[in-house]
Amino acid sequence: VFTFHHLKVDYKNGEKWSKEPFDFMKLKHLFTEWQEKMDQGGGWNALFWNNHDQPWALNRFGDTGKYREKSSEMLATAIHCMRGTPYIYMGEEIGMMDPHYSSIHDYVDVEAKNAFAALKQKGISDDEAFAIVKTKARDNSRVPMHWDDSKFAGFSESKPWLLPTDQDRINVEKELHEGEIFAYYQKLIKLRKHEQLISDGHIRMFLKDDPQIFAYERFLKDEAKKILVFTNFYG
C-alpha cells in the first residue's frame, strides 16, 4: 500500500503552497496508525521519504547543515526498520538535498510556475512567493544525480534540463571515498536482510506522546529476540 499523507504534514491547513514547519506529532501519529493497523490486519506498507513529485525529505524533516549526514541516517533508520518494503529514491543514499535556486526561472515544472503566479495574484510579494514555491517544488528532487563534482555533476557533458548546485560537496564519487551515508544505507539493508524480525516481524510503538522521539520495537511472535529503534528528529 502506497500512502502519501506523511508527506503533507508541512501543508498549512492542507494547502501545499505554504511555508510551514512540519508537524512532527502528526507525522508520528500517521506512522503509528499505519504500522499498528497494517500489522493487526496483515497488510503491507510501502516505506519511503522521497519520490520525483516531492522536495527532498532532508530539507523537510531533517537538517541540511552541520548534521546533514547524521540527519540522513536518522531518517533512513526511521523507515527502514519499520514493517513494510522500504524504497530508496536516487540520491538520498548520498544525502542529496534541494538545489539552491534563486529564481522561479531556474525551475521548469509547470506546477511550480503556475503556483508562483497564483500566489502573486493573491497579493504575495515575488520574494515570498518564490520562498514558498522553493520549499515544495517537484523539481527539487528531479535534479540529475550527483555522480561527481564536475559542472553538470557527471550526468552529462551538455547542459541538463535542471542544473545541480551542490555537486562540489555532495556526489557519489566523494561519498564512496569520504562519506558515511552510503555505507550506513548498506548496513541498514544488510541488517534488514539478515534479521527476520525486521523483514517479517511485528511492531510495537513506544513514546507515542514524546515531542521529538519516534520509537518502536520489532519482534517475532515468540518475542525471544527484539530490536529497539529510537530516532530523534530534533537533537
Language-model features and meaning:
Residues V1-W17, P21-M25, H29-T32, K66-G235:
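Loop/helix patches that line or flank the sugar-binding groove of alpha-linked glycan CAZymes
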Residues K37-G41, C81-M82:
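Alpha-helix C-cap/termination motif
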Residues G41-K66:
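Active-site clefts of carbohydrate-active enzymes
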